[in-house]
Amino acid sequence: MHKNSKRNNNLRVSHTEANSVDAEKEKNESQNNFFELLPAEITFKIFSQLDIRSLCRASLTCRSWNDTIRNSDSLWKPHCMTVRAVCRREIDDDLESGYSWRVILLRNYQKSKVKHEWLSGRYSNICSPISLPEKIMYPMDADTWGEILEAELER
């Protein structure tokens, strides 16, 4: 019987050590993720100050940041409103279809960049298709090309 009690004591020490290691690990994780210590309103305020690129990078930091950023639709709305200046019809159509602000931004961000370049006349004097930069092209519908043609005719 005496041997069993020694063995149980050894198990208890190991169990206590394991709890200590777990507690230390949780403490380190909490220190590394100070956002979890802040009130949700403060965290949201900080994230709302980020530009699109920084917001996307922050969402890659950890699961809790990703969840917060991904599920806070109001973080994405101001960025959508900026894109809407160039892609009004597309944004309005997506809103009517019930997409979230985040999805609307994902669907239209790159298109808005390319469309803005076309509308601003960046490609007005292209001599051949070879002159077009391939990496910034984006498929656009007939209505968008119509807007671009109208802008070209007004120049």
Swiss-Prot record:
PROSITE patterns, sorted: FBOX (PS50181)
Family matches, as CDD domains: F-box_FBXO48
CC terms in the record's Gene Ontology section: cytoplasm; SCF ubiquitin ligase complex
Span of the signal peptide: none
Domain annotation F-box: ranges: 32-79
Source domain of life: Eukaryota
Region (Disordered): 1-27
SMART domains: FBOX (SM00256)
A Gene Ontology biological process term: SCF-dependent proteasomal ubiquitin-dependent protein catabolic process
Pfam families: F-box-like
Extent of Polar residues compositional bias: 7-19
Protein name: F-box only protein 48
Organism: Homo sapiens
Gene (UniProt): FBXO48
